[in-house]
Amino acid sequence: LDAGMTLVDTADVYGLDWGGTGFGACEEALGRVLAADPSLRDRIVLATKGGIIPGVPYDSSAAYIVSACEASMRRMGVDHIELYQIHRHDFFTHPHEVAGAFAALHGRGLVSMFGVSNFSVTQTLALLAHVEVPLVTSQPEFSCAQLAPMRDGTLDLCMEEGLVPLAWSPLAGGRLATGEGIRPELVAVLD
């Protein structure tokens, strides 16, 4: 925080071991940190994501998104979230319904801004056509080992629509440090 990095980005699914335990664990841990030092809350931009349900796998229905956001807030012990993102596209929920969930959360003062994570360009455009509260972010996987957003139109869409691109896994899941699964010539350049 003292270096100016104030975005704290988490998700309800972070901490899940996919064996059925740990859902919400990272948000709970962050909640303990914020409870131990409440002054931190005013120094961070809090971002979280929802919409992944183990075994389903995705649910972006208005009822689920609203309840997932409220549950995230309880786990973190906060009364509002600056940025809430849909974690992955749900093919079975119409973008109009997602937009309605965003409007409801914003209208209640629970969330300031909204975005998407792991959405294609066309999925983002479909949601943009329905939102009342504008999207502000798109969060693709993006690193020097994963350059697809430069080629698939994601970064172009961000520029066109004024979305902030938030890279997830910018260090390629740690592989840039270890070299595992990375082309040797890229590792040589990074070293």
Label each residue range with its predicted role.
Residues 50-66, 87-93:
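Active-site mouth loops of central-metabolism enzymes
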Residues 73-92:
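Active-site groove signature of glycoside hydrolases
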